[in-house]
Amino acid sequence: MNVTSTWIKNPLAILADNSENGVVIQGNKIIELVGKGKKPKSTYEKVYDASDSVVLPGLINAHHHFYQTLTRAFPGALNKELFPWLKSLYKVWAHIKPEMHSVATELALSELLLSGCTTASDHHYLFPRQLHDAIDIQVSVVQKLGMRATLTRGSMSLGERDGGLPPQSVVQDDEEILIESERLINNYHQPDEGSMVQIALAPCSPFSVTTELMKSTAKLANKFNVRLHTHLAETMDEENFCLQKYGLRTVDYLDSVGWLSDKTWLAHGIHFNEQEIKKLGSAGVGICHCPSSNMMLASGICHNLELEEHGCIIGLGVDGSASNDGSNMINEVRQAMYLQRLKYGASKVTHNRALEWATSGSAKLLGRDDIGEIVIGKQADLALFKLNDMRFSGSHDPLAALLLCGAQKADRVMVAGQWLVIDSQIVGLDEGELIYRHSAAAKELSKLSQNY
């Protein structure tokens, strides 16, 4: 079978070295970088003129909760910090039906894709009885859209009755969680280069799972060589919970259950002291910075630069769309740059550094060395942005303008060599119909929660 080659020609700007005149794509891979004033050495059948486009590696979202798109700007959860925010929404989320979860996943992924995101990791930890096959549903939606995903089998096993935060209606027992985790790995995890679906294991947080489950999950992940993920040190409430229940701060607790390794990435990671930062860095633990969520819930600011300095990888995530309340990845890069500048100053947090967190940084968090960069041999995942909106008029540095002028939508997005977005529209998707179905599901969920 002949594989078509395409020259993405003469980009306005590109986040790659020695590629001023573009890149050549063959099948699902990048096969050549075309330097300034040069033409491809490789043969090519198609040419795409990118002279009005900024070309980025596909953005990678390393932490999300797709189902939360159903409870954006939810009245009972407004103007609250993490623990009261969660308690107000657990009782709503407990009523999510399979069809609601499916449309929430489709909308979250579509919103991400339109913002230039080509790979997304979802942390789904909510399994009320009617939603036992939540990850299977997500796999189907991911395959339908053609994006890449790391779907994490989350869990909650420590309910209010046993001193945890979530209500009993959304917790499972440890054995059920471990059996399901192994089933999902066996059924869906693709460890090979270029894979479209991977599975990771992700107990929700120290305040919602048992110590035994944390230990058993680490052993299971090691057995199947999959990655580990959880929320950690998002708020001081969490630190206080761990001190009161376990007599340990969060990092020491994580160490005690066998989680400090380079196969672990953590969401948020805000409230670490200097010794803990060094300990995490020595172990190679990754941190997913979620700036919009951290600002919305007033959680704090992640110590990105100290963490990087001591060996941690930093990536980016939009977090749940009820604590953001969006799923826009290019906007999240802008938020990260601005929030980190407040902490470290403008010169230390450049637009290039923020973009690297959202591309190569997030790829490393997910354990992927085949995506996240425009490099020969890596997957052809690209996001192209045009600077023809009013917001960009008068801008001079195209890469900087993406963030400083507030890009919102990609013009084209390629995943594995296939255009999934053309002219800021997802190929084959009726956006209006999706919004209608999603809005109806959100309204139904709200009504269900009010009846209990």
Label every PLM stretch briefly:
Residues 256-263, 305-389, 404-405:
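His/Asp/Glu-enriched, well-ordered alpha-helical/loop segment
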Residues 130-269:
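Metal-coordinating catalytic core of metallo-dependent amide/deamination hydrolases
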Residues 73-123, 128-147, 179-193, 439-450:
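Alpha-helical scaffold segments that flank or form the walls of functional sites
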Residues 1-41, 53-55:
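N-terminal metal-binding scaffold of metallo-dependent hydrolase/deaminase domains
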Residues 70-101, 130, 158-174, 236-263, ...:
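Active-site gating loops and adjacent loop-to-helix segments of metal-dependent hydrolytic enzymes
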